[in-house]
Amino acid sequence: MILFCDTSALVKLYVREAGSDALLAEAGAASAVAVCRIAWAEAVAAMARRARDVPADAEALDAARQRLREHWSHYVVVEVTQALVERAGDYADTFALRGYDSVQLAAARTVQEAGREDLRFACYDARLRKAAKVLGMSVFAEAGAP
């Protein structure tokens, strides 16, 4: 199984939050973890913002960013192409998604259609999770998540 992580899921692999343990276990069970190229900028920005907002966590967040940098080359990275962003635009319209959420969904769909292995989609946004289900994706969800 390939685990596709949107940015919220990717951050949970590096920053200890509710749900991190379950997601880390899922990532450990996967044959590969896939991400969209934009997840790099989004994840680094999220960690930097949190470090500014909670200065006491800055050192741990710097370490998390360094681990992300070290691990990045091990991920299956889906490139952002014209075809992908056009598909993302369709998904934004069809599923009422935010721009980058629709790009994440289109990237996951690209991996799913490549069909090398089953894909499981990990995210922490209910609307995005629902759209992935409509597209026939297996969705990672913690107990109690819709």
Question: What is each stretch, according to the model?
Answer:
Residues 35, 79, 99-102, 122-123:
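Short beta-strand scaffold positions
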Residues 1-39, 50-63, 137, 143-144:
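Short, well-structured N-terminal submotif of metal-dependent ribonuclease cores
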Residues 18-21, 25, 49-52, 67, ...:
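Noncatalytic, solvent-exposed loop/strand surfaces
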Residues 40, 70-95, 102-107:
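Acidic catalytic patch
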Residues 11-17, 75-80, 121, 135-138:
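Short, contiguous hydrophobic alpha-helices characteristic of membrane insertion segments
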